[in-house]
């Protein structure tokens, strides 16, 4: 049975500055409390929902929905080292039974000229049906651990409206930015700064997903993938000397 989180406090303006604007709200459902900071950026076309939940209920599936009003029969979902398209309509009984499907950092619904990406930093149960995008936030099941989701949760999900389809809109890069945010640090002034990377590639559709020491201790292993299903040539730049390269 669906329930709406109707006990919502009036929005409070928490921050208002040149970097971002933050509006805070809280929702109460049964014995649980969910607090959210909704973050708007002047120079970033993304809205973040920084969420903190003190969850005390069992057998309640907490979900969020965004009515997208986008005309598309297929949606794209990120999987490991790529993406997959799935239907947005239910034509068979097994489609109806799949109230959600798995995706990693993003899911996207696009039509010609525009689209909406739903990003997250740790939630993987998605649904996109009839123009509505949903994301499962807390499951609160009781098996095998009867108190698996009881306690404090902190996570962020975002909406990213964009022009064109997700490939041109840099949805993948935006999802990586959410999951690996920029970290700043103060350091003594020592002249002009510079840029150095141990490994980089020169194509925006290619990602260095992993770098590790070889198990025999002789060299490094790189895992690089192309994320837009396009043919491309790339150059791998290494910040150290190498003797030879092997393709695994």
Where are these regions (language model features)?
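C-terminal (or distal) subdomains of carbohydrate-active enzymes
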Residues: 1-248
């Amino acid at each position: 049975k669906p329930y709406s989180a109707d006990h919502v406090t009036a929005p409070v303006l928490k921050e208002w500055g040149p970097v971002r604007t933050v509006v805070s709200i809280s929702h109460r459902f049964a014995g649980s409390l969910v607090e959210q900071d909704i973050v708007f950026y002047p120079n970033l076309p993304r809205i973040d929902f920084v969420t903190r939940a003190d969850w005390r209920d069992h057998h309640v599936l907490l979900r969020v929905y965004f009515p997208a009003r986008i005309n598309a029969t297929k949606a794209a979902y990120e999987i490991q080292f790529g993406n997959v398209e799935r239907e947005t309509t239910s034509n068979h009984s097994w489609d109806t039974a799949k109230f959600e499907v798995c995706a990693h950092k993003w899911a996207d619904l696009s039509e010609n000229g525009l689209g909406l990406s739903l990003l997250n930093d740790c939630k993987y149960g998605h649904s996109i049906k009839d123009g509505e995008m949903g994301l499962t936030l807390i499951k609160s099941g009781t098996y095998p651990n009867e108190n698996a989701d009881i306690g404090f949760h902190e996570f962020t999900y975002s909406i990213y409206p964009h022009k064109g389809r997700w490939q041109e809109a840099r949805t993948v890069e935006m999802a990586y930015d959410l999951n690996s945010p920029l970290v700043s640090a103060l350091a003594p002034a020592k002249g002009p700064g510079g840029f150095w990377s141990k490994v980089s590639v020169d194509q925006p559709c290619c990602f260095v997903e992993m770098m590790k020491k070889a198990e025999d201790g002789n060299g490094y292993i790189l895992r690089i993938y192309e994320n837009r299903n396009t043919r491309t040539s790339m150059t791998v730049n290494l910040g150290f000397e190498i003797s030879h390269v092997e393709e695994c």
